[in-house]
Design a protein with these regions (language model features):
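C-terminal catalytic "cap/lid" subdomain
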Residues: 1-311
Length: 311
C-alpha cells in the first residue's frame, strides 16, 4: 500500500517519516483494493478486504472478531484479501512481513493448509545450493543452520520470517508449503513437479484457545519459577505466586508471558492473571497473602492451567 501510494502521489523519497508513510498507505490502500477487485471481477469472483494489525491477532477477543469476519465472508462466498493495516501500524507494533501475518491468520481461522509463494522453489540447503529440502518435520537449530539466510533470496521477509511462519502453522496443526510464485500457473506447477518444501504439522490435540496462546508472535515478559513450581507445572497444575522467583518485562493482566525455570529453559506460555508490577509484589508469597499485599484479590493463580500451554 505504501509503495502504491508513493507511485500515485509521485513521491520518490526512500526514507519517509512514520506519520507520513501512514498517510501515504491510506492513499495506496484504495488503489490496491481496486486493482484486486478488477482481477477478481474478470473471473467473476467476489472479494472483501481485511486490514489487520498485531493487536487484532494478539488480543484474544479481537482475534475472535477477526475469525467471525472471515466466517461471514466465506458464507457470502467472498474471497478475503488480507493485508497489514499500514495506516495505523507503527514501527514498534507491526508484522512487517506477510509470512507471519498469513500464518497467524491461518491459525485463527483454523485453516489446514497455508501456501507461501516466494521467488524460489522451496527451502534450499545452503551446503548444496541445488538441493531443496522437501520435508521439514521440526524447526530447530539444524534447520536454521541449513537454511540460506539471505533476505533477498526469499522475498522481502527473508527466510527467517518464513521459518517463523512455519512454526506457527506447525504448532496449530496446519500444513505449510513454500514454493515459487514467480512463474505462470504456480500452484499447478508446484503440484505437478513437487517443487516445494512441505512443513509438516504436529498432530495437534490443542483447543483453539491453546493454539492461539502458543502461536503468539512474542511474549510480553517472563516469570522465573523454582524447581517445585516447575514440577507442578509438568503435572498439569496452575502457576501460583509461591513458586515465582523473578519477573522480567513490563506487562499487564491478560498478556501472553513465558514461564522459565531456574536454568533459563522455557517451560510454558500463558495468560497472566496479574500485571508484572503485581507479580513482583507477590512473588514467593502464599495465595492467602495476596489480598493483604495488593489490597484486593481477583484470582489466586498467577497463570491458571486452562490459560497455559506447556512447551
Amino acid at each position: 500500500a505504501i509503495a502504491l501510494g508513493q507511485s500515485y502521489l509521485n513521491i520518490k523519497k526512500k526514507k519517509i517519516k512514520l506519520e507520513m508513510s501512514q498517510a501515504i498507505a491510506a492513499v495506496g490502500q484504495i488503489h490496491l483494493a481496486g486493482e484486486f477487485q478488477k482481477l477478481f471481477d474478470k473471473n467473476k469472483f467476489k472479494s472483501g478486504q481485511i486490514l489487520i494489525t498485531p493487536d487484532d491477532t494478539e488480543q484474544r477477543r479481537r482475534a475472535l472478531n477477526v475469525r467471525r469476519t472471515f466466517d461471514n465472508l466465506f458464507k457470502l462466498k467472498a474471497i478475503p484479501i488480507v493485508n497489514e493495516n499500514d495506516t495505523t501500524a507503527t514501527s514498534e507494533i507491526k508484522y512487517g512481513d506477510n509470512d507471519r501475518l498469513a500464518a497467524r491468520v491461518a491459525q485463527i481461522i483454523g485453516a489446514d493448509t497455508l501456501i507461501i509463494l516466494s521467488d524460489v522453489d522451496g527451502l534450499y540447503d545452503k551446503f548444496n545450493k541445488n538441493k531443496i529440502i522437501k520435508k521439514v518435520l521440526k524447526i530447530d537449530n539444524k534447520i536454521y543452520d541449513l537454511a540460506e539466510k539471505k533476505i533477498n533470496t526469499y522475498g522481502s521477509g527473508g527466510i527467517i520470517t518464513k521459518l517463523e511462519a512455519a512454526k506457527i502453522c506447525m504448532n496449530a496443526g496446519c500444513n505449510m508449503f513454500l514454493g515459487n510464485g514467480k512463474k505462470n500457473g504456480a500452484l499447478e506447477r508446484m503440484i505437478k513437479t513437487k517443487s516445494y518444501t512441505h512443513f509438516v504439522p504436529k498432530i495437534s490435540t490443542l483447543h483453539a484457545r491453546e493454539k492461539w496462546i502458543i502461536s503468539s508472535l512474542s511474549s510480553s515478559g517472563k516469570v522465573y519459577i523454582d524447581n517445585g513450581a516447575a514440577r507442578a507445572l509438568m503435572d498439569g497444575k496452575s502457576l501460583l505466586a509461591a513458586g515465582v522467583t523473578k519477573v522480567m518485562g513490563n506487562f499487564e493482566k491478560g498478556e501472553n508471558i513465558m514461564i522459565v525455570d531456574e536454568k533459563d529453559k522455557n517451560l510454558a506460555r500463558g495468560l497472566s492473571s496479574f500485571s508484572s508490577l503485581e507479580i513482583d509484589k507477590i512473588k514467593g508469597k502464599q495465595s492467602g497473602e495476596i489480598e493483604n499485599i495488593l489490597g484486593y484479590l481477583s484470582k489466586s493463580e498467577i497463570i491458571h492451567k486452562d490459560d497455559m500451554v506447556r512447551l
